[in-house]
A protein has these predicted regions:
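Positively charged, Gly/Ser-enriched RNA/tRNA-binding surfaces
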Residues: 1-40, 90-255
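Extended alpha-helical scaffolds
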Residues: 38, 42-56, 66-70, 74-79
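Acidic, His- and aromatic-enriched active-site or binding-groove loops in soluble protein domains
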Residues: 61-93, 218-220
Length: 255
């Protein structure tokens, strides 16, 4: 079926990965070795890392609730863009509601904090109000943050420039982050007839990825074919029922 999510694939993975960088590199190296049996003229190895996006969001001056929203919906491209538009316009903040909340807050301050209202103590309710009142966001700040995120997701360059481009971006936007080129599993721009590219927006297709992600597209008989993809999924096994967190990284070839 055309839209089926079930695909014929053969894969390999490292379960219980203890050396993240070496194991990430091993999976990519194994994928490249497997290409030796395929006939192709050229191609692209695209590498991304969703962990960098998470680190960026953690550094931005936006309310905690917005950080959670952006991280939760990073995988939903269209909805994520809608969130950025709301962030720019303060669409989630009604000034009238804020004023009413503040009045309720001041009224509750005069009451006994142990008094229960709808199953919660006034103390708990005050704590919630306090968080909302101290977590304001102006429209200008929302626009600035949205612009930073959009600019970040446009970064695309040869892999050997990845750290340089990211650090230039962080410095320009006064983000307290620095990335070393050794952070990436590969630094050669050309491997096995493949151009190696870094992309900040790549890796948003599957929600379970937690770090490095990659795909290999090859040109064969004038057609571009996605033959392999993979990445790190340190939370997937526990999401499927494991009692403990098991780090893992793997890849699969489409048959």
């Amino acid at each position: 079926k055309k839209d089926s999510i079930i695909r014929d694939q053969v894969g390999f993975e490292i379960i219980g990965s203890k050396d993240e960088k070496n194991d990430d590199k091993e999976i990519i190296t194994t994928s490249l070795k497997s290409l030796q049996n395929l006939k192709y003229s050229s191609g692209t190895l695209t590498i991304g890392n969703v962990e960098i996006f998470k680190l960026l969001i953690s550094k931005l001056e936006i309310p905690a609730r917005w950080k959670l929203r952006l991280l939760r919906h990073f995988w939903r491209d269209e909805y994520f863009n809608d969130l950025l538009k709301r962030l720019e316009t303060n669409a989630d903040i009604d000034p009238t509601v804020v004023a009413v909340d503040k009045k309720k807050y001041l009224d509750l301050l005069k009451q006994d904090p142990t008094t229960m209202i709808a199953g919660r103590s006034i103390g708990e309710i005050l704590k919630r109000f306090d968080t909302k009142i101290k977590d304001p966001r102006t429209a200008s700040k929302g626009k600035k943050v949205s612009k930073i995120i959009r600019s970040f997701l446009k970064i695309k360059c040869p892999i050997n420039n990845a750290a340089k481009e990211l650090n230039k971006f962080f410095k320009k936007n006064k983000i307290n982050l620095v990335v070393d080129q050794k952070y990436f599993p590969i630094s050669n721009n050309k491997v096995s007839k493949l151009n190696v590219m870094f992309s900040t927006s790549f890796g948003r297709q599957l929600e379970y990825y937690t770090g490095m992600v990659f795909k290999i597209d090859i040109k064969s008989n004038s057609k571009i074919i996605n033959c392999c993809s993979g990445g790190r999924y340190d939370g997937l096994i526990s999401d499927l029922g494991s009692q403990k967190k098991v780090s893992a990284v793997g890849a699969a070839f489409n048959l």
